[in-house]
């Protein structure tokens, strides 16, 4: 049986990118900030929980599946993150897991899996971020920041597994943006 529902992809962070739609469609997407820079984790958690309830626990917009990007492992970040950021990211994801429990199917994907799918190979963030944005624009997804672009790439990655018959149009082999 082919998947015919809607997928919500979340690049969970202080500024969370999201993408939503069914495989084969053009996703809707956006980004939202949870908390002020330097603000409390508790405030960010509360803002995240309110957003999930308001935007995604509504009958017309409920996803059939939610996929999120794994929080970055500190050793991979090469000292570019701190303990507060790690706690925030893990806390947001833990909240998401609890919120989805017995309500929504939840899946997880790593950054390297998504980049290999969407860009044809995994590469460092400084190279991958602008390429991901360019790839989204090439596909007609007018993203305005890297959070939205990462969420769209994650959405496309998950849709490929759900409906491989619809994935060829976004396969990196057909990308002009990736030919260099």
Where in the sequence are the language-model features?
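Phosphate- and other anionic-substrate recognition elements at nucleic-acid/protein interfaces
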Residues: 1-180
């Amino acid at each position: 049986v082919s998947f015919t529902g809607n997928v919500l992809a979340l690049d969970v962070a202080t500024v969370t990118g999201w993408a939503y739609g069914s495989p084969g469609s053009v996703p809707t997407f956006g980004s939202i900030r949870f908390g002020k820079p330097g603000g409390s984790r508790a405030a960010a958690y509360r803002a995240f929980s309110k957003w999930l309830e308001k935007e995604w626990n509504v009958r017309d917009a409920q996803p059939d599946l939610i996929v999120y990007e794994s929080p970055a492992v500190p050793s991979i970040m090469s000292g570019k993150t701190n303990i507060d950021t790690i706690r925030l990211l893990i806390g947001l994801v833990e909240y998401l897991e609890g919120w989805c429990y017995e309500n929504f199917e939840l899946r997880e994907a790593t950054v390297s899996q998504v980049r290999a799918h969407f860009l044809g190979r995994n590469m460092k963030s400084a190279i991958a971020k602008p390429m991901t944005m360019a790839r989204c624009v090439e596909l007609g997804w007018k993203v305005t920041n890297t959070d939205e672009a990462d969420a769209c790439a994650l959405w496309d990655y998950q849709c490929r597994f759900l409906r491989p018959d619809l994935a060829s149009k976004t396969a990196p082999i057909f990308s002009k943006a990736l030919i260099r």
